[in-house]
Structures are given as C-alpha cells and as structure tokens.
C-alpha cells in the first residue's frame, strides 16, 4: 500500500488517479503515523522548497520520513519538488536545509541562457543506469516537466538526465530512494508504466 504524503504542497489527486488506473492501492497520509501503515511512500510537490520544508516540519513529517526511509528502508518516490526536497539544501527564497537523503543541492536555471523559465513541457530522457523504475521504458523516451530549479549531485545517484540549455538531472536513485524531476502522473502511458514499476518494488 502506497502512502501519498499530504503536506499542503502537491497535487495528490492526479497521482492518486494514476495509481488507480494501474490498480495500485494507495491512500492519503495526512499525519506522520499514517506512514507506518504503508509499505511504500510517495512525496509529491509543487511550489517553493522553503515553504515545503516548513510544512513538512510543522506537520511532523521530517523525523517520520527519516525513520521510515533511512531506518525502516521503505521505498520512496519523490516527484518534482518532492525530488528536490531529498537533497541537502535548496536556495529558493534563501538557503534552506532539505531532507538530506541524497548529497547535493537544488539551484535555479541560469537566466542568461535565454531559456523560458520554468522549463515546461515534454523532454527526452537519457537513461544512464539500470533503475528499476525504467524497466520496460526505452532510452530517449519523453516525459513531462514543469520546474524552474534543478538538482546538482554526484553522478552515482543520477539515473537519467535531460537537456534544457544544458544537461540536468531528470531522475535520481540511491538504494530504495527514487525520484523524478518530471511528472510521471502527467506523462501518459510511459508515466503510468514508471508508477507501476514503483508499485511493484
């Protein structure tokens, strides 16, 4: 059973509907105790890094997530801002500490690259390592992105990259911690396939 974490910073309905389409049982986790009932966790997210961390702290999710992910070793999937929160720090609205599951930081796309920010739309993935989420998904497949910030971390944690002005991290994997900068729930059949792969872990 997959817990969709409700910390007032994500569109849970679209993710829940996507899991329903593939027959994966899920529920909305509104408090830290709910995480104990799940065998997998999903952290969605839209909006500001700093505001999201503030919400997680106020709702008591930070220590609960660290217990479930780092000690209990439950698989977790972070989507978009959810992925960024897995890093050590972000700079949106000032320096802010993240969950620290993966070493690295979150920075904004450089405005001098003549890019439209946010990066919004379909983009091709370069899959770099065997990540169970990409089972049955071909390299160079397109997924849907909406973001102004991107992750900088060690290559060993990067499972896919995409190109927007320069190459950036499209997904991460470290042990049973998985994350996508793109939105699988908005990425049609391939997105559903990726969510199905996560549900089957």
UniProtKB/Swiss-Prot annotation:
- Report the domain of life of the source organism: Bacteria
GO CC term (a single one):
cytoplasm
HAMAP family linked to this entry:
HisH (MF_00278)
Active site (catalytic residues): 80, 183, 185
Q: Does the keyword Lyase apply?
A: yes
InterPro entries, per the entry? Class_I_gatase-like (IPR029062), GATASE (IPR017926), Imidazole-glycPsynth_HisH (IPR010139)
Q: What interactions and quaternary structure are annotated?
A: Heterodimer of HisH and HisF.
**Which keywords does this Swiss-Prot/TrEMBL entry list?**
Amino-acid biosynthesis, Cytoplasm, Glutamine amidotransferase, Histidine biosynthesis, Hydrolase, Lyase
Q: What is its EC number?
A: 4.3.2.10, 3.5.1.2
Write out the annotated subcellular location.
Cytoplasm
Residue ranges of every copy of the Glutamine amidotransferase type-1 domain listed in the record:
1-201
> Which Pfam families does UniProt cross-reference here?
GATase
Recorded protein name is Imidazole glycerol phosphate synthase subunit HisH 1
Functional note: IGPS catalyzes the conversion of PRFAR and glutamine to IGP, AICAR and glutamate. The HisH subunit provides the glutamine amidotransferase activity that produces the ammonia necessary to HisF for the synthesis of IGP and AICAR.
What's a single GO MF annotation on this record? glutaminase activity
- UniProt xrefs under PANTHER family: IMIDAZOLE GLYCEROL PHOSPHATE SYNTHASE SUBUNIT HISH (PTHR42701:SF1)
The metabolic or biological pathway listed in the UniProt record of this protein is:
Amino-acid biosynthesis; L-histidine biosynthesis; L-histidine from 5-phospho-alpha-D-ribose 1-diphosphate: step 5/9
- The chain's coiled-coil residues are none
Q: Which GO terms describe its biological process?
A: L-histidine biosynthetic process
Q: What is its main location?
A: cytoplasm
Q: Which gene encodes it?
A: hisH1
**Catalytic activity entry:** 5-[(5-phospho-1-deoxy-D-ribulos-1-ylimino)methylamino]-1-(5-phospho-beta-D-ribosyl)imidazole-4-carboxamide + L-glutamine = D-erythro-1-(imidazol-4-yl)glycerol 3-phosphate + 5-amino-1-(5-phospho-beta-D-ribosyl)imidazole-4-carboxamide + L-glutamate + H(+); L-glutamine + H2O = L-glutamate + NH4(+)
């Amino acid at each position: 059973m997959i817990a969709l974490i409700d910390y007032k910073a994500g569109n849970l309905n679209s993710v829940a509907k996507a899991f329903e389409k593939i027959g994966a049982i899920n529920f909305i986790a509104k408090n830290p105790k709910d995480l104990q009932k799940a065998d997998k966790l999903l952290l969605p997210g839209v909006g500001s890094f700093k505001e999201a961390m503030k919400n997680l702290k106020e709702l008591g999710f930070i220590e609960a997530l660290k217990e479930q992910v780092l000690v209990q070793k439950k698989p977790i999937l972070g989507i978009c801002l959810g992925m960024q929160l897995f890093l050590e720090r972000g700079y949106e609205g000032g320096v802010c500490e993240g969950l620290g599951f993966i070493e690295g930081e979150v920075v904004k796309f450089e405005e001098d690259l003549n890019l439209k920010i946010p990066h919004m739309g379909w983009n091709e993935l370069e899959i770099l390592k065997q990540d169970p989420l990409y089972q049955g998904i071909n390299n160079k497949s397109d997924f849907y992105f909406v973001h102004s910030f991107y992750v900088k971390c060690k290559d060993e944690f990067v499972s896919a990259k995409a190109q927007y002005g320069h190459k950036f991290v499209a997904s991460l994997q470290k042990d049973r911690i998985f994350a996508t900068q793109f939105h699988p729930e908005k990425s049609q059949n391939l997105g559903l396939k990726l969510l199905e792969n996560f549900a089957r872990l």
